[in-house]
Design a protein with these regions (language model features):
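Terminal beta-strand-rich extracellular "head" domains
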Residues: 28, 37-38, 43, 54-131, ...
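Sequence-level motif detector for i,i+2 pairs with an aromatic at +2
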Residues: 1, 20-23, 59, 169
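Extended, low-complexity regulatory regions
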Residues: 49-53
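Glycine-rich, low-complexity segments
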Residues: 3-35
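Short, solvent-exposed loop/turn segments enriched in Ser/Thr/Gly
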Residues: 45-47
Length: 179
């Protein structure tokens, strides 16, 4: 993980740095693979793929950018929530309607040979100078226990014709923006 921190930024003439400027950037790249099982109706909070940032001001905004490569063991809908300090804020979920799950992102896996790229972008206003931790929470709509994979597919082998067992990477980038 890389972190760039500064105590103060001023213009060359000594004036205050204008709003909207980048104050610090933190990134976490995941290059290895991982897997986890989720039972029917269950969820999984993936704290191994996470990044944290400590805002320098209560007026700062945090631009959250995630590129996730995700695979599954079956044809299913996968739902993902952006977790911030252990919970998903309403602003990071779709509107409610009946008993439908409120999610940050979702996709339908129609095959298990490849990885699905899931991009997530969210502008967070923490109103705090305490550390903010970001990770993902997963669920699916299958009536059975299913295996989920990060940075690999279900068909993880060297055989031809199945994407040759793709091994992509995933990344979280947190950018503090002066507010």
């Amino acid at each position: 993980m890389s972190t760039l921190k500064v105590n103060a930024i001023t213009e060359t003439d000594g004036s205050a740095f204008p709003l909207g400027k980048v104050l610090q950037v933190v990134s976490h790249s995941k290059n290895d693979t991982s897997s986890f099982s989720i039972s029917s109706g269950g969820t999984h909070d993936d704290t191994n793929f996470a990044a944290s940032i400590t805002p320098s001001s209560t007026s700062s905004k945090i631009l959250v950018q995630i590129m996730l490569n995700h695979g599954t063991s079956s044809n299913q809908i996968t739902g993902i929530r952006l977790m911030i300090n252990g919970s998903c804020p309403d602003a990071a979920k779709g509107n409610s309607s009946g008993s439908r799950a409120r999610l940050t992102a979702a996709y339908h896996a129609e095959e298990t040979a490849g990885c699905h790229v899931v991009p997530i972008t969210f502008l967070h206003s923490p109103n705090s100078t305490s550390q903010q931790t970001y990770n993902l929470n997963y669920r699916h709509n299958s009536g059975s226990t299913r295996t989920h994979y990060i940075n690999r597919s279900n068909d993880d082998n060297n055989a031809s014709g199945n994407g040759m067992g793709p091994r992509p990477m995933s990344i979280i980038i947190l950018t503090e923006i002066a507010g």
